[in-house]
A protein has these predicted regions:
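Short, charged/polar micro-motifs that form catalytic or ligand-binding hotspots
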Residues: 3-11, 43, 47, 104-107, ...
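Short, hydrophobic/amphipathic alpha-helical patches that form generic packing surfaces
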Residues: 12-23, 89-94, 158-162, 219-226
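Charged, alpha-helical interface segments at or near domain boundaries
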Residues: 31-129
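Short coil/turn segments at secondary-structure boundaries
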Residues: 71-76, 105, 174, 233-240
Length: 255
């Protein structure tokens, strides 16, 4: 068994693909740098992430894949699932070797796997856009927090920056303990020192942190939500399918 160890970054994965072709040795397993090696292995290659190699591989993939298929690579990577790295490696190798495009060849298990995984991430991104609820803080920053299944926040920045260009905001991922802050000029990545703070657990800011009118707006939104609800048309099963229960604690109207 041939093992490649890399730094668990997307750039490291692209470098691993470059190294495999250069060495004419392809890994049976990709591991993070500190992961224990399997008992039965024949060769271990330490991948050193290299910007030049990464750029060359990405340019090659850009020539052989459509923009949509190229984006699916990023979506798959952001799934952070255990199988994503090896799945992407096999897929990119097939793309490199194929004389024509393979992105529509869903009979291939790796092509199908990349499509299905990227779709799951895309669906989760859309849920974040749909269900993000902002709370206005006392310092006039709009704060939104969620706990998405996948690491989709990097895929939402453009939307929030465009949609709320005239308002400072923070979106925070409670699962991965990081977020983004927009100061009306730039978007920067942030973290909170106390990852166990109460508002990170239940998704609601304490009253003393809120703008003086925030509670009034929240009550108004709840009243509107309940007033437009037609009791005779309630369908709890469909409601939970369209609005998964795992998001409810972050929704003002479900408080």
């Amino acid at each position: 068994m041939t093992v490649f160890q890399y730094d668990s970054t997307f750039e490291g994965l692209l470098t691993a693909l470059f190294d495999a072709y250069y060495r004419r040795t392809f890994p049976d397993l990709l591991l993070a740098e500190k992961e224990p090696l399997p008992l039965f292995h024949e060769e271990v290659h330490q991948v050193v992430t290299d910007a030049e190699k990464t750029e060359r591989v990405w340019k090659l993939l850009s020539r052989k894949l459509s923009r949509r298929a190229l984006a699916s690579l990023t979506y798959c990577w952001l799934s952070e699932t255990p199988e994503a790295a090896m799945l992407l490696f096999r897929y990119m190798r097939k793309v490199t070797d194929a004389p024509a495009s393979i992105e529509q060849n869903f009979a291939d298990p790796d092509v199908l796997g990349v499509y299905q995984l990227s779709k799951k991430v895309a669906d989760e991104r859309m849920r974040v856009l749909q269900f993000m609820r902002f709370q206005k803080t006392a310092d006039q920053v709009y704060f939104g927090i969620m706990e998405p299944l996948y690491n989709v926040y990097p895929l939402t920045i453009h939307h929030f920056r465009d949609r709320f260009a005239d308002q400072p905001w923070i979106i925070y991922d409670a699962r991965r303990h990081y977020g983004y802050y927009y100061d009306l000029k730039e978007v920067s990545e942030i973290t909170f020192e106390d990852s166990r703070a109460a508002f990170l657990r239940h998704g609601k800011l304490e009253d003393e942190l809120l703008d003086k009118n925030e509670k009034l707006f929240q009550e108004g939104w709840k009243s509107y939500f309940h007033s437009v609800c037609i009791q005779s048309r309630l369908n709890p099963v469909k409601h939970k399918k369209d609005m998964p229960v795992r998001f409810w604690r972050y929704l003002t109207e479900k408080d």
